[in-house]
A protein has these predicted regions:
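Terminal low-complexity "docking" segments
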Residues: 1-126, 130-178
Length: 178
């Protein structure tokens, strides 16, 4: 069983909230028009207003998977393999708690779209690029990691060698597993 197939099976376990995908549209041939919106029950650009329109073909997008059927599995596996997406999982809700809403997860990731350089100049932060996220996470301190992970249990992506890479927060430290 491949690492992706094993991960997909885990996502289907009872009590698991629907996973999300962070998609870096900058690498999608044909731009935003070619994004696989039909596998998501909610899907939005992480930029808003004029910026979302102006940069729609290179912007980050967040989608919550509508199902874990074969079509969604194939699309997610393809996005991961082409280094265009990061699979985001949430922890199972405790007791009668509900998992965070799409709006809450969307707001959480929007917080990281802009960072400030050494001279206070705002800069776009492409944290959603699967080719760099692990290296970015490795330089964050404990508080920054706690803030970044927020409601997220795991980030799953394909490494440079194609192997699945899982990132999580464990005791305030980044844990990376291949």
């Amino acid at each position: 069983m491949s690492a992706f197939t094993e991960l997909w099976s885990q996502l289907k376990q009872p009590g698991q909230p629907a996973p999300y995908m962070l998609i870096d549209c900058a690498g999608v041939e044909g731009g935003a028009e070619r994004l696989p919106r039909d596998i998501f029950d909610e899907f939005e650009c992480l930029f808003t207003g004029d910026l979302a329109e102006e940069l729609e073909d290179v912007a980050p997008y967040l989608g919550r998977l509508a199902s874990l059927g074969p079509e969604a599995q194939a699309v997610v596996e393809d996005l991961l393999a082409r280094h265009l997406g990061i699979l985001v999982t949430l922890p199972p809700p405790a007791g009668s708690d509900e998992p965070p809403s799409f709006s809450q997860v969307h707001r959480h990731f929007r917080k990281f779209n802009v960072v400030y350089g050494p001279e206070g100049k705002p800069l776009f932060f492409r944290y959603y690029d699967p080719r760099v996220i692990v290296d970015v996470l490795k330089v964050l301190d404990e508080q920054q990691l706690i803030s970044f992970f927020g409601p997220v249990a795991w980030l799953c992506l394909a490494g440079a060698d194609g192997c699945m890479v899982h990132c999580t927060l464990a005791a305030g430290q980044l844990a990376v597993r291949e």
